[in-house]
């Protein structure tokens, strides 16, 4: 999911439980002729606990279902005496999965936007200006292309490598900000990137133990297959970075695109993504009946005489238990997004980053115990470097924020 870029918390009207006071042109608060405003309710520990538990429950379940959908093999037909071990197949229909996910997210995002709008006020437009269509379309295309590359990489690397690399989005985001948007970073952020890169390299070089269920088949072509999987995952991360940097640009440019909030981005991006992927599923088979066009597209889907949609429906009819996982996956992702946006509007972004980073760590640990993965000391060192770097960034950001608040308080006293 690519819906909460850094900095979008500035678009909310309330943060850390406080609201901005109305200010006149001379900079003083306007109170003449008005009744004193009632203090807004400060979000308490109960709300914080609900948000944290909601994010953990939604995305831990989402992660388990994602691994179950994309890595578990199912027999093509029931075993018999003549064929006790029939061939197996795996759910590889990433665009179908992406379409279901974006549909659920668009619906839940719209419901959130509708019911969170105060009574008597108009629901904010999903596409407020024409200028915003291009960056939103770019976000939808990059996010729609990113998922197939990510899911395709799971055929060559295990889920733990996938999750650890997905925790390193700082790398492509920083690269694209430096090259496209000419944005500079403080020195400590480059140190964080170095730690994260060393952690990923350490974890990858000490190739993680595969699941007990697929260890025999994975050992046959481990080295070359893993390199190809890392290549696919690198493309996925680059597209994720393009998605996030474009979102940052939209949120930080209200003078160009008008004020645009997180829920609006959630709905708009998922609607456009659903339209794009549905069009692909319905139109592309008629344009590529021989599979030649598939080979030219930058999407790692092997050519097939069947359409992906028809193949996915056929797979789900043979394995109806997977359909439950797919629907649960989409629902957990959509609900998780709602908790993220609520947390972003009621608390600080630093808290949200802390919650999501620890959630990713718990996802990895849950994967270890749930699916029988094993980790060596080298892999644990890699994990420690990655999350140590991200944790150090959170500490520095907290100190910077405290320094800014103290400086602001001193300035206010002088005035």
UniProtKB/Swiss-Prot annotation:
One of its GO terms (molecular function) is UDP-galactose transmembrane transporter activity. The keyword Transmembrane helix applies. Belongs to the nucleotide-sugar transporter family. SLC35B subfamily. InterPro entries: SCL35B1-4/HUT1. It is found in: Endoplasmic reticulum membrane. Keywords: Endoplasmic reticulum, Glycoprotein, Membrane, Sugar transport, Transmembrane, Transmembrane helix, Transport. The gene is hut1. It is a multi-pass membrane protein. Residues 1-39 are annotated as: Disordered. One of its GO terms (biological process) is UDP-glucose transmembrane transport into endoplasmic reticulum. The keyword Glycosyltransferase does not apply. This is UDP-galactose transporter homolog 1. Residues 9-33 have a biased composition (Polar residues).
């Amino acid at each position: 999911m690519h819906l909460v870029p850094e900095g979008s918390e500035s678009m909310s009207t309330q943060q850390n439980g406080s609201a901005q006071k109305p200010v006149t042109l001379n900079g003083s608060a306007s109170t003449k002729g008005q009744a004193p405003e009632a203090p807004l309710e400060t979000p308490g520990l109960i709300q914080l606990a609900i948000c944290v538990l909601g994010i953990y429950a939604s995305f831990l379940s989402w992660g388990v279902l994602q691994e179950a959908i994309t890595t578990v093999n199912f027999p093509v037909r029931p075993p018999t005496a003549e064929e006790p071990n029939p061939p197996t197949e795996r759910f590889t229909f990433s665009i179908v999965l992406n379409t279901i996910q974006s549909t659920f997210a668009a619906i839940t995002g719209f419901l959130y936007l509708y019911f969170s709008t105060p009574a008597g006020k108009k629901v904010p437009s999903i596409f407020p200006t024409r200028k915003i269509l291009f960056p939103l379309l770019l976000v939808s295309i990059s996010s729609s292309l990113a998922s197939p590359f990510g899911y395709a990489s799971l055929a060559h690397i295990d889920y733990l490598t996938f999750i650890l690399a997905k925790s390193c989005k700082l790398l492509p985001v920083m690269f694209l900000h430096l090259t496209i948007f000419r944005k500079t970073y403080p020195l400590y952020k480059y140190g964080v990137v170095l730690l994260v890169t060393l952690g990923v390299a350490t974890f990858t070089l000490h190739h993680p133990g595969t699941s007990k269920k697929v260890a025999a088949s994975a050992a046959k072509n481990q080295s070359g297959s893993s390199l190809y999987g890392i290549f696919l995952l690198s493309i996925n991360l680059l597209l994720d970075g393009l998605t996030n940097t474009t979102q940052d640009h939209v949120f930080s440019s209200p003078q160009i695109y008008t004020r645009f909030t997180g829920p609006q981005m959630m709905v708009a991006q998922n609607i456009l993504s659903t339209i794009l992927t549905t069009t692909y599923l319905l139109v592309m088979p008629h344009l590529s009946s021989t599979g030649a066009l598939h080979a030219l597209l930058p999407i790692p889907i092997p050519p097939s005489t069947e359409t992906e949609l028809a193949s996915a429906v056929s797979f789900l009819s043979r394995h109806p238990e997977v359909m439950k996982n797919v629907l649960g996956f989409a629902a957990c992702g959509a609900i998780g997004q709602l908790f993220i946006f609520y947390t972003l509007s009621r608390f600080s972004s630093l808290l949200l980053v802390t919650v999501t980073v620890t959630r990713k760590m718990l996802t990895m640990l849950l994967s270890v115990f749930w699916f029988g993965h094993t980790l060596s000391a080298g892999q644990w060192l890699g994990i420690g470097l990655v999350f140590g770097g991200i944790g150090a960034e959170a500490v520095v950001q907290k100190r910077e924020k405290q320094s800014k608040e103290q400086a602001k308080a001193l300035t206010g006293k002088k005035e």
